[in-house]
């Protein structure tokens, strides 16, 4: 929390000192403290639409994120997600966490847009900054771009962000369709599926950019919302299917390394030490056996401890 110098509100989850990539630990923390978390959100965030932001490969966000979204939806909130996929260079544990996280996230009904950043697309700090800039630019469209030819209002921005499924926002410099289409392919997000599923295309486009060209590139939406900009284009495509191909790559990485990791973990639990070095023990007089079940309760308790110690005698 100390790194969030400019955060308007901060809340420290009770007993939350990090989860060491343990998703189950994060879930228990949220369950135990949810009443306080919900009260904080209710008191400080009156917005109609909330986004829960988390890395899917860690422990805290990966475990708590989907659960928190589900709980907030149950409270009547409109909730979306901004989450991050681990790069192929990250650990197998990060990929396991991410895949389990998306298994839960994709089963939640009624979520708003899900923005899925991909650490395989570049430096993670740069990717985060790029997304924040693009998201803010999209929110500013109604105030920044007004034209007799067409406008986008706040309700259309909200309708776009409430669309269930994967979404992406791109910001392209240039005055023709090809540059916007290139931005929709080369960006900070997980690669889109090839099924061309899309609900809305909402964009402030320069005069030479054709909405029809964008539809040919990404798919036919239910509706489009367009404003007219100057020398830049800001485009949101939403209601897409989750990035199954990219998620399958993570699954395969785990599967390929499963046997090796299991063997390594089992090896640390085995010992090659010989147990017959102290031949002098064979010359010691035998201890008197104490019949099982005899004696007082205290004696039986000592017998139990003796059984444990006998493994080392």
What do the PLM-derived regions correspond to, one by one?
Residues 1-313:
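Tubulin/FtsZ superfamily GTPase core signature
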């Amino acid at each position: 929390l100390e790194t969030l110098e400019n955060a308007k509100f901060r809340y420290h989850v009770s007993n939350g000192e990090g989860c060491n990539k343990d998703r189950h630990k994060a879930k228990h923390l949220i369950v135990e403290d949810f009443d306080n978390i919900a009260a904080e959100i209710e008191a400080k965030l009156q917005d109609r639409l909330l986004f829960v932001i988390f890395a899917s490969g860690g422990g805290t966000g990966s475990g708590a994120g989907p659960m928190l979204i589900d709980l907030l939806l149950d409270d009547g909130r409109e909730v979306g997600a901004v989450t991050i996929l681990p790069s192929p260079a990250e650990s197998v544990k990060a990929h396991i966490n991410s895949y389990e996280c998306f298994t839960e996230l994709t089963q939640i009904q009624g979520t708003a847009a899900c923005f899925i950043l991909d650490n395989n697309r570049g430096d993670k700090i740069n990717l985060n900054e790029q997304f924040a800039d693009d998201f803010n630019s999209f929110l500013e469209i109604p105030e920044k771009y007004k034209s007799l030819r067409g406008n986008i209002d706040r309700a259309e921005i909200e309708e776009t962000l409430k669309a269930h499924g994967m979404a992406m926002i791109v910001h392209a410099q240039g005055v023709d369709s090809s540059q916007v289409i290139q931005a929709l392919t080369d960006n900070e997000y997980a690669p889109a599926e090839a099924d061309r599923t899309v609900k809305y295309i909402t964009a402030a486009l320069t005069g030479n950019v054709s909405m029809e060209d964008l539809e040919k590139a990404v798919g036919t939406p239910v509706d489009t919302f367009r404003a007219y900009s100057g020398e830049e284009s800001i485009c949101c495509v939403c209601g897409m299917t989750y990035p199954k191909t990219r998620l399958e790559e993570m699954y395969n990485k785990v599967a390929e390394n499963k046997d090796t990791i299991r063997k390594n973990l089992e090896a640390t639990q085995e010992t090659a030490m010989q147990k017959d070095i102290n031949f002098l023990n064979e010359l010691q007089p035998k201890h008197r056996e104490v019949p099982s079940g005899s004696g007082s309760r205290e004696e039986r308790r000592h017998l139990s401890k003796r059984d444990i110690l006998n493994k080392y005698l």
